[in-house]
């Protein structure tokens, strides 16, 4: 047998006589048929990559301001002006992110948002609803727990850590996210004049937040670890993250009144003031807020400059609280009705009971936030006994249940 007859393709095993060509390599042979097959496979792979790239380029349609506002209406009662401001700001923010993929000589700046409104007016809910609608990661932090790096308390960069955790440490997703910082009015500096002493929980936190809010590349330890020199860090670009800050800003109304020479009666949110001989709500007054007013309140100028969009929220009245109990898609009464239906029991709230609950929340000055506590207290004993009561068909919460702590009316199957 000659050496030529022993030669064969190292891939398909065919002998030299069975193929047109056999090409020698350093440690084997490949036939023309295997070369053609490999060429076809690589060509198909290129086609698949092109299809993948085209598919990735097709982003979901960005909802318009009208669509954003309509979605907020499904979950948040009232606050029409704030919804409009938020809808436009959020639309422009994500439009800016998409425009960065296209070459443009004009660089679009980021517009973070400041929500001003009393406790329980819906600031947090608005931010959460926006993130859920846009399907982007969301993280929330309480400004009062934050301190400068190196001091006892929560480092401001921990906020980014929360955002990363909420998207399984996908940096690209995190950089499209929304961060809500509550109680921002509680980190004001103690006086208008700079102090020689270090204010690590007031002005110091504002300074620490400044870089994150305006945009920086932050180094975050992976999977919630602590920073150390040898560790490989995750780098997050915060210039693409939308920051929404919220606070009650109690007393800001007086600063605006003083500047505008306004005289009014009543104090706090919801009071009426007189401007140009006309009575308007404090919400209208807060629409006139200027950077100087916020500086006098205690925010530093640099921080104010990073929150150019201001959305005032009004205090919720009795009618709004009743609507909050019943109208949103995830209204409180609907949630408890679902809980009771899991036991095959119907739950009903009379209109008088709803009004009484709204009045109780107003008296507590807790806004919508206090409604869950009220409903939970009213139904505690009933929910405790529920699984043990036989033949129960319906539970009715009446006005007396709220005002006189009476047990809800129970109706049984006959």
Swiss-Prot record:
SUPFAM superfamilies per record: Glucocorticoid receptor-like (DNA-binding domain), P-loop containing nucleoside triphosphate hydrolases
A GO molecular function held by the record: ATP hydrolysis activity
Gene3D superfamilies according to UniProt: 1.10.8.60, ClpX chaperone, C4-type zinc finger domain, P-loop containing nucleotide triphosphate hydrolases
Residues that coordinate or bind Zn(2+): 9, 12, 31, 34
PROSITE patterns in the cross-refs: CLPX_ZB
InterPro entries per the UniProt record, alphabetical: AAA+_ATPase (IPR003593), ATP-dep_Clp_protease_ClpX (IPR050052), ATPase_AAA_core (IPR003959), Clp_ATPase_C (IPR019489), Clp_protease_ATP-bd_su_ClpX (IPR004487), ClpX_bact (IPR046425), P-loop_NTPase (IPR027417), Znf_CppX_C4 (IPR010603)
GO cellular component annotations of the record: HslUV protease complex
Residues at which ATP binds: 118-125
Occurrences of domain ClpX-type ZB (ranges): 1-50
Alphabetical keyword list: ATP-binding, Chaperone, Metal-binding, Nucleotide-binding, Zinc
A GO biological-process term: proteolysis involved in protein catabolic process
PANTHER family reported for this sequence: ATP-DEPENDENT CLP PROTEASE ATP-BINDING SUBUNIT CLPX-LIKE, MITOCHONDRIAL, ATP-DEPENDENT CLP PROTEASE ATP-BINDING SUBUNIT CLPX-LIKE, MITOCHONDRIAL-RELATED
Subunit structure, interactors included: Component of the ClpX-ClpP complex. Forms a hexameric ring that, in the presence of ATP, binds to fourteen ClpP subunits assembled into a disk-like structure with a central cavity, resembling the structure of eukaryotic proteasomes.
Described function: ATP-dependent specificity component of the Clp protease. It directs the protease to specific substrates. Can perform chaperone functions in the absence of ClpP.
Family label: Belongs to the ClpX chaperone family.
UniProt protein name: ATP-dependent Clp protease ATP-binding subunit ClpX
